[in-house]
């Protein structure tokens, strides 16, 4: 890892503290002028209270935030600025888990497009052919094929962390390897 290059790091938060961490990271960006970005996938849910409905924002993945910064800045966020983040470890290298840029871009694109239509699984799905989506809104996304209940899904994997699957017609896919 080079010192000045930015990486995506996967970090855990305490239970129900995702929005507090987001607020702290926003404050560090604006007041402390730290060179960092973050990604917290959220969606809106309408809950029925006694006599009214309430629209609230909830995280798609509980207790998980992605931080884009240099390794030193990522360490400073929790050690110096006391933001309650716990970086996940890569089990093979025993260092902080780094998510590749392409995987992160694909994941953010799919989550921003339709967070309700995405199913997230932390366990590994059926291993299939590597494919690229060539038509539609998801054009350019690279993933693997999974078939569940006779429907075709493209599975996007973030190594050692999670998988996201999106329903895609078979005619939109091209096998790449």
Label each region the model flagged:
Residues 152:
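Glycine-centered loop/turn positions within well-structured domains
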Residues 140-148:
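Short beta-strand-centered aromatic/proline hotspots
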